[in-house]
Amino acid sequence: MELNNLKPAIGATKDRKRIGRGTGSGHGKTATKGHKGQKARSGGSIKAGFEGGQMPMQRRLPKRGFTPLMRKDYAIVNIGQLDVFESGSTVDAEALLNAGLISGVKDGIKVLADGDVTKSLVVKVHKYSAKAKEKIEAVGGKIEEITL
């Protein structure tokens, strides 16, 4: 067996469907398009969402909500993830990036209270929840709010 003699297993590949190449192929004459009608013509596709003149679903349903212009996109870290750091260490943006807990700072870093922290840490972030602060301070840690 050589690399230039490798072939896929029998039945692992299919021949492509060659349409409109004679009746013997099984896909001749109408070339799998049936008889007449819009879908049999060239360029005869119907645009997405078109319902034959009936008011389409995306126009029947009301618009909802809005996007706040000043919304901040925080990188989220849960306190359960902070156990990767050694006790007494300072956890800041650089440390979180190096540990792979966040992929970027975005509009800041926010710490949430999901999970449990067992080590005393000094956490320096842009935002945090009240529960997260409670849990960090309960094990002798400290949380500081920094500006971006």
Curated annotation (Swiss-Prot):
One GO term (biological process): translation
Single GO term (MF): rRNA binding
Biased composition (Basic residues): 30-39
Stretches for region Disordered: 1-61
Domain of life: Bacteria
InterPro entries attached to this UniProt entry: Ribosomal_uL15, Ribosomal_uL15/eL18, Ribosomal_uL15/eL18_sf, Ribosomal_uL15_bac-type
Subunit structure: Part of the 50S ribosomal subunit.
PANTHER family, per the entry: 50S RIBOSOMAL PROTEIN L15 (PTHR12934), LARGE RIBOSOMAL SUBUNIT PROTEIN UL15M (PTHR12934:SF11)
Alphabetical list of NCBIfam families matching this protein: rplO_bact
Protein name: Large ribosomal subunit protein uL15
Gene coding for it: rplO
